[in-house]
């Protein structure tokens, strides 16, 4: 509800005139629906429809399950469970748009059903209908976005920022303290502090990418306000006279992901007798930045132990603060089902990780499918929980969730100004070109190029992330065919080495004085970015189940020897007499990403191998290694990508890649490539290895030649016991699937890495 206002005063809202786009394709005549009610469940509530820019209700006359089914499907749910009459979810306001709705049950939208017509009704709001939908989302219903959070009259609040007041706050990024301003009609407007609460500050800070808020010195800011108001030439005095206090009052619960969800009272228009902010001043907010965005690292303190705290991480996101949600339970990482997944629960995840509130809650494995167990389903948060583990939830195995239903988030992050310090020039489109960066040279900002020495896919990934362009497709060292910016011809950065977790190239290691062996020009670094990427994952269980030993005669290993699939000691044997002891196994490599996995080299450069009569499209596709418990290699092998193809695909997905007849090579999204145990080079040569306990390791795409959304799951490891005659593999797992101490006990070393993505 809005606060009551005198009818003689005209009000105007700081709201966008355009409606937020729907998350599903709809025709221009399709009406938006929403569910409103006292519960925090997104799948149930009072049914409301948007018509002529105003939300209204639906009467329960003639309403039944088939009408509820049409409404639920339009809202993105699979079906309807039931419906409720007599305003069970509370009485609505405004018009009753529809009455005597009659559907066959096959309509795609509610406005395709029969009714009395728009606004033709003899009902009262005590007859408002409600629906309860099945919590499972339809395939293809992608996300709940902040832009879909409509305010009054179907409109939404615009952008928010903090205008720094203190001189010290103006010199640093991100800005964490200042006056709240909102953007309308191309101008920034102020917000009155009357009735301003910490709940309001929490919502504003969340929108700006900060997990929490803190109190401000209101007495100091009031003193500054009074001094500036006495100065007739001050900007503040001028703005006040122009009645720039657009929002007069805000009332938030603190759990809202956006100000559009708060109650807003809007200031009177210009020329009205009532002042916009009588006796008040602009609202001032102070936010607390997450650990990734603080200007100075906090001093080490004794942290309170939370033994039961549920650990959360994000995977496969293109940007900082986005990814598939994974939680650590029973010492193993697993995913979260998207049933009942919404912005409030997603915001708890974001804040737990040090980001702001969620700007998007994604459904249907939109950021790729995870591995292992599905730990949680039907997560229901109220918004103030410290961790996701404090929310109500079911076990993921209880309601038939699959990894196709993995939930993901996109969080609000602070504006660090990084995106303005890199650009691409000369490319065919905005997603490719020569990399130009801005650095300080003798205290003066200067644009220039990056030396391509040591330039690789990791550095390109950081660049694309900094630009907000997703993943890197190619890292280019030779860019003579792209014309850069004339004023940025000089090399200003060289020796760049990134770990992959940086938010900007400027955070990577690099030379002090620039040293580039090639000089500027054609050897400047370049990138080509893409919105989505593949994600290769090996079936660890199949490796464990199919491992065995074979003593293979040298007479049958000529081709394998030619392709370097045997240990070095094989070079000194008396061919064709003797044998090699081989640890053989089968492997399945799945593409769980959002784009096809294709060889980096074009087919014109594939190499023909006469012995096996096949083409190599990637020099090394996998590494097979046997390690001691301290990580030293005792045996190794490699497998060239002689045949990348879709061996099998899920039902309904067509195979796209096949090696026969010099066909295209690759692995399509959702498909997998199988290498049977009985083909050449599908082994590790352990002839020279003595009995003992070892670690068996397989790494896919080991040199990161082809871009992926997540490289951390490219490795599997198994415990291996070899007694000289037999071999046992057990505890096979993806490299990042267990928590650190479980890995330590298994391998005596910590291999887990969890970056910002």
Swiss-Prot record:
Give, as one word, the top-level EC class: oxidoreductase
Per its record, how is this protein called by name? Lysyl oxidase homolog 4
Query: Which family would the database say this protein is a member of?
Result: Belongs to the lysyl oxidase family.
Q: Which gene encodes it?
A: Loxl4
Function of the molecule: Catalyzes the oxidative deamination of lysine and hydroxylysine residues in collagen and elastin, resulting in the formation of covalent cross-linkages, and the stabilization of collagen and elastin fibers.
Organism, scientific name: Mus musculus
Q: Please state the Enzyme Commission number of this protein.
A: 1.4.3.13
Q: Which residues form the SRCR domain?
A: 33-134, 160-288, 312-412, 422-530
Q: Which SUPFAM superfamilies match?
A: SRCR-like (SSF56487)
The feature of type site (Cleavage) is located at 570-571
Which compartments does it reside in?
Answer: Secreted, Extracellular space
Which residues constitute the cross-link Lysine tyrosylquinone (Lys-Tyr)? 639-675
List the Gene3D superfamilies. Answer: SRCR-like domain
Q: Does the keyword Metal-binding belong to this entry?
A: yes
What are the recorded GO MF terms, alphabetically? copper ion binding; protein-lysine 6-oxidase activity
